[in-house]
């Protein structure tokens, strides 16, 4: 693609994790039986009136603040009119003319460096019913009316890697703010990708192709790379690029045409008369506070001297970060090494997340404290961590029951060192010429005979003291 550049814009649909729907009191439960969490408002019964969800508005303000946006001080809603069975009232309530947030940006990082992605707008709207296509088309209205925020970027993204980084940053922000589960595989974060190509140096946009409802990072990357190659090939062979709506097919790893657009669809937007304009006071907006954002968390971890590889894992998984942050231990660098080496590794071996192991943070704190006080060894720490899964008892009792207490008593260690020396006098006499070999041999035997329970540092001190006195 040396002679062309990709122009990419992304529309993200983010389902909010409110308890009830956008304009009705119906509860949101994605595990509920089909068509059981609906009421007359969701089904568009005549005479029903929408009731705006305040929690969804607060979520919109949080996201607008996180994305450095101008927040509209007056809430307006509009009707997007179309006839389709996924919204039985014949229109979707959205924000067309006055979105809750506009003119924002977010910074992303790729292998090529940092880039600022400008965002045109975010607006609140309701989701549609879920459709299941088979021999018959089935509709589940449980999803109809679920609160959404649509995030519309400007067409400033220029590669698949940038697109993935941008969507991932939005996901991480949503998780940090606790406004959405942002699980692409469950459809709570979906991306529509708009792609066009143009010769480098040209300012005019090429013909845009839209790829709908992409729900994984791999699919985003593959779909964009495939579509770029396809459009480039068409340009080079003078084949026209049509304005089309496509979907990405995982099996063929290609984009497939759903429909060709012959013109702009007129949705006949007009103000939603059943929801009055709602003024948002400065006090109301200022009272909406943000949690620590991904880049703020990353900065804090760097100050705590946590390694980059651990920072990446923590900032990519907000629940993991919350679990890690809840462990009360001053040396965060040391904690991170122990946490990832033992807790995260254990979780990976069980194919679960670390916070799903049900290890109490207080138990981890106590166990690390025992390690610091040399009551247990590093080897014992490794053995204890798996025992803490679903553990509900006394840590001191646990380590005694499993014989994991480290032996640091100087008198006991002195006795054991003397026993090893007495049994290996011939080798020990070589200490003055081959000190390293003798020390390694004696310490190795101590660890072997007493099951690695001896404090190695203390054993080394005692051994050197005895040998230096013996051969001075």
Curated annotation (Swiss-Prot):
Domain of life from the UniProt record: Bacteria
One MF annotation (Gene Ontology) recorded for this entry: ATP binding
One annotated GO biological process: translation
InterPro entries, sorted: Asn/Gln-tRNA_amidoTrfase_suB/E, Asn/Gln-tRNA_Trfase_suB/E_cat, Asn/Gln_amidotransferase, Asn/Gln_tRNA_amidoTrase-B-like, GatB, GatB_Yqey_C_2, Gln-tRNA_amidoTrfase_suB_CS, Gln_synth/guanido_kin_cat_dom
Keywords: ATP-binding, Ligase, Nucleotide-binding, Protein biosynthesis
One Pfam family it belongs to: GatB_Yqey
Catalytic activity as recorded in UniProt: L-glutamyl-tRNA(Gln) + L-glutamine + ATP + H2O = L-glutaminyl-tRNA(Gln) + L-glutamate + ADP + phosphate + H(+); L-aspartyl-tRNA(Asn) + L-glutamine + ATP + H2O = L-asparaginyl-tRNA(Asn) + L-glutamate + ADP + phosphate + 2 H(+)
Enzyme class: ligase
Keyword ATP-binding: yes
EC number: 6.3.5.-
PANTHER family listed in its UniProt record: GLUTAMYL-TRNA GLN AMIDOTRANSFERASE SUBUNIT B MITOCHONDRIAL AND PROKARYOTIC PET112-RELATED, GLUTAMYL-TRNA(GLN) AMIDOTRANSFERASE SUBUNIT B, MITOCHONDRIAL
Known function: Allows the formation of correctly charged Asn-tRNA(Asn) or Gln-tRNA(Gln) through the transamidation of misacylated Asp-tRNA(Asn) or Glu-tRNA(Gln) in organisms which lack either or both of asparaginyl-tRNA or glutaminyl-tRNA synthetases. The reaction takes place in the presence of glutamine and ATP through an activated phospho-Asp-tRNA(Asn) or phospho-Glu-tRNA(Gln).
Assembly information from the UniProt record: Heterotrimer of A, B and C subunits.
Family of the protein in this entry: Belongs to the GatB/GatE family. GatB subfamily.
Protein name in the entry: Aspartyl/glutamyl-tRNA(Asn/Gln) amidotransferase subunit B
Organism: Mycoplasmopsis agalactiae (strain NCTC 10123 / CIP 59.7 / PG2) (Mycoplasma agalactiae)
UniProt gene name: gatB
